[in-house]
Amino acid sequence: MLKFRNFFKLTLLTLASAFFLSGCANINLISAVGSSSVQPLLNKLSSYYVLNENNDNDKLVEISVQAGGSNAGIRAIINGFADIGNVSKNPKEYAKENEKKWRDKKLKTLTIGKDAIAVIYKAPQELKGKLLLTKDNINDLYDLFAGVKTINIDKFVKKDTKNMSNEKDYPLTSFPRTGGSFASGTAEAFLNFSALKSDKTLDSQTRDILKGIINYGPLAKPTSETNIEAFNTFVTNLQDPNLFGMIYLSLGFIQNNLQAIKNNGFEILPIKYENKEVLPSNQTVSQNEYKWVRPLNSIVSLSEENKNIDEIKTFFNWLFFNGKKDVIKNIYDEFGILQLTEDEKKKMFKTNDSSPMNLENFWVDDFAFSNPIFGAF
């Protein structure tokens, strides 16, 4: 019921905005709803575009970007409550579940950027900088965030420093996103995209909890969807010097708030891929060394019934192909989000040709592809 209420509020807000702007001559409202990870980036990009690039007096636009979660974004675009559905996950499962609507509305998934998931932690002083995530303890991390089993910090201590924590157990508290991967693109990326393959099967109860099928256990403290609210909950609940815990956040948020993270005594959890320890950064992500990466998607309808389709295409053409590259890059850098490579862009073209001269093969719906991948990856 709570999820429906939130979605209903977002719908009313979008409709109210449309009603208000309908009285303004020559202004078309483009409404975007969904992922709280996509929202700040798209809001800044669209604001710059509206103020500096939208010069056609006959087709002036206002782009309203609201958060609410990836699930809300998908439902909004499928049901026609928004022009753009923002989703920080691959929407393939939703597309298959709603294939008729997806086809009828000619929905296209646009990957506008990529972000990484990273874990920060609070540890006792003697263990700061001594934790490591590997394929051998990734399931322990998932059990921790499910909140049913007590998971002590020694599960994540590097083997060569384990003797430092033998005298005392330090149980961890986890701070997952409310609703699990069903509601949150951040939670889905946390569960599915680590690229660490454990030799052991993940506990079925843990998986169902993290998917949002059943509620978190009593040892977890679920947070709101946005990074800032989740982080503030983490800070508030770990004020006691004897309490320790972990939370997953967007890498973009971590990089932009690194000083606050350090000031609170928190550390970033490195990952061991094969034989190399890697800390998350734009550089390690772009070099494919840090692999816990997710897409940031905007889904649009290419249906002839979409009265704003021309303005929507013009905006995204500006973003992908025609805009000032330095300006756009600076906006991405501000949020710690990576732009797509040319090879990644090609995946959104039906003919694998990302030339701006080939846009008729870019603006085709997801199911027009012989093997739909729904965005760039």
From Swiss-Prot:
InterPro entries in UniProt: PBP_domain (IPR024370), Phosphate_ABC_transporter (IPR050811)
Disulfide bonds: none
GO cellular component: plasma membrane
Primary residence: membrane
S-diacylglycerol cysteine lipid sites: C24
Membrane topology note: Lipid-anchor
Record key words, sorted: Cell membrane, Lipoprotein, Membrane, Palmitate, Signal
Pfam families: PBP_like_2
Superkingdom classification of source: Bacteria
Localization of this protein: Cell membrane
PROSITE patterns on file: PROKAR_LIPOPROTEIN
Lipid anchor positions (N-palmitoyl cysteine): C24
Signal peptide limits: 1-23
Name of the protein in its database record: Uncharacterized lipoprotein MG412
Record organism: Mycoplasma genitalium (strain ATCC 33530 / DSM 19775 / NCTC 10195 / G37)
